[in-house]
Amino acid sequence: MALKEYKPTSPARRHMTVADFAEITKAKPEKRLTKPVRKSGGRNAHGKVTTRHIGGGHKRRYRLIDWRRDKDGVPAKVAAIEYDPNRTARIALLHYLDGEKRYILAPVGVAVGDTLLSGADVDIRPGNALPVRTIPLGTVIHNVETAPGSGAKMIRTAGSFGQLMAKEGGYAQIRLPSGEVRKVLQDCKATIGQLGNVESSSVRVGKAGKSRWLGIRPTVRGLAMNPVDHPHGGGEGKSGQGNPHPVSPWGQKTKGLKTRNNRRTDKFIVTRRRPGVRNTQR
């Protein structure tokens, strides 16, 4: 993937970059492998806004991705590399030898015509899915399960990858893109390689209208609001927030407050991610 720039015919065009989509080989998805997406506008079943800054955007169909890779031993040929509007990574259409078709996330190095496999005794090559116990230490992986058979839950963003660090006592230690080292059972499956569309994080939107195409509405600062709308609002001119600690519109402390409260899975974290480091591998 490469980024495409435009002539500076406007301030938006000057700063905008887009993916060149050179790797895409098929324009329309397999209809049987899609389903409709109903937009929520950030509202729940009662019509109340539960997630702000969501609404509008281009109409989409959801692509059904094979997260489990459970067709062990059945060869699959890569028929196409497609765009998926619901995620940053590209997706690959697989045609299995028994006639079934499935989508997977497309890793770097997988091209149309390649044959992919899943199972315990398959080759270590990009796109193949194996139990972690059969993967050599130091191998770059993605699409990692957190429980055997649950389907991939970790390392699914474009350009991301993890690394198998150690195996001990039925568990494997995997370094995640955030720098965190986490334990998973060795029977969990993972896919070999780094996910494609590597430069996705470097794309510059360029203009507000493009965010609206993506279904992202404006984010208004609390400081710019009236006191009735936000604790930071009001005052004459550009006055401060008036609070000893930044708060949300509902008065809860924000910015720097710890949000993780899942002690049940703390035992699986070997090394915490480093604060302020989003991805240490790029």
From Swiss-Prot:
Coiled coil: none annotated. SMART domains: Ribosomal_L2 (SM01383), Ribosomal_L2_C (SM01382). Gene3D superfamilies: 2.30.30.30, Nucleic acid-binding proteins, Ribosomal protein L2, domain 3. Keywords: Ribonucleoprotein, Ribosomal protein, RNA-binding, rRNA-binding. InterPro entries: NA-bd_OB-fold (IPR012340), Rib_uL2_dom2 (IPR014722), Ribosomal_uL2 (IPR002171), Ribosomal_uL2_bac/org-type (IPR005880), Ribosomal_uL2_C (IPR022669), Ribosomal_uL2_dom3 (IPR014726), Ribosomal_uL2_RNA-bd_dom (IPR022666), Translation_prot_SH3-like_sf (IPR008991). The keyword Ribonucleoprotein applies. Residues 31-54, 223-282 are annotated as: Disordered. Residues 34-54, 270-282 have a biased composition (Basic residues). One of the primary rRNA binding proteins. Required for association of the 30S and 50S subunits to form the 70S ribosome, for tRNA binding and peptide bond formation. It has been suggested to have peptidyltransferase activity; this is somewhat controversial. Makes several contacts with the 16S rRNA in the 70S ribosome. Belongs to the universal ribosomal protein uL2 family. This is Large ribosomal subunit protein uL2. It comes from Anaeromyxobacter sp. (strain K).
